């Protein structure tokens, strides 16, 4: 599912909302989650899961085309941990 499909489904289930309004709401939610993660905060959606950022240490990598060793800098990556309710639903 892509974002536009999500917007269409939510709009279909909520006929009192215009699709443009639903799209604005979905975009606002994603923007707030992104901003919180960029600030190093954790975003928890009870029962669904939690978004956070984790540090990936600097390491030596290898260029797959040439085989040359390449230094890869430390970086922050987004991480999602599923909530218990979501895990239970997936494993029914």
From Swiss-Prot:
Entries under InterPro entries matching the protein: Hist_DNA-bd (IPR000119), Histone-like_DNA-bd_CS (IPR020816), IHF-like_DNA-bd_dom_sf (IPR010992), IHF_beta (IPR005685)
GO CC term (a single one): chromosome
One Pfam family recorded for the sequence: Bac_DNA_binding
GO BP terms, alphabetized: DNA recombination; regulation of DNA-templated transcription; regulation of translation
CDD domains: IHF_B (cd13836)
Record-level Gene Ontology MF annotations: DNA binding; structural constituent of chromatin
Superkingdom of the organism of origin: Bacteria
Keywords: DNA recombination, DNA-binding, Transcription, Transcription regulation, Translation regulation
Family under the similarity heading: Belongs to the bacterial histone-like protein family.
The protein's assembly and partners: Heterodimer of an alpha and a beta chain.
Purpose: This protein is one of the two subunits of integration host factor, a specific DNA-binding protein that functions in genetic recombination as well as in transcriptional and translational control.
This protein's name: Integration host factor subunit beta
Organism per entry: Bartonella tribocorum (strain CIP 105476 / IBS 506)
This protein's encoding gene: ihfB
């Amino acid at each position: 599912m892509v974002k536009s499909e999500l917007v269409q489904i939510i709009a279909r289930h909520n006929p009192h909302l215009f699709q443009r309004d639903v799209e604005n709401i979905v975009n606002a939610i994603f923007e707030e989650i992104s901003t919180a993660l960029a600030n190093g905060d954790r975003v928890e959606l009870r029962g669904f899961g939690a978004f956070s950022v984790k540090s990936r240490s600097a390491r030596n990598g290898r260029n797959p085309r040439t085989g040359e060793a390449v230094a890869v800098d430390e970086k922050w990556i987004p991480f999602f941990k599923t909530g218990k309710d979501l895990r239970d639903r997936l494993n029914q």
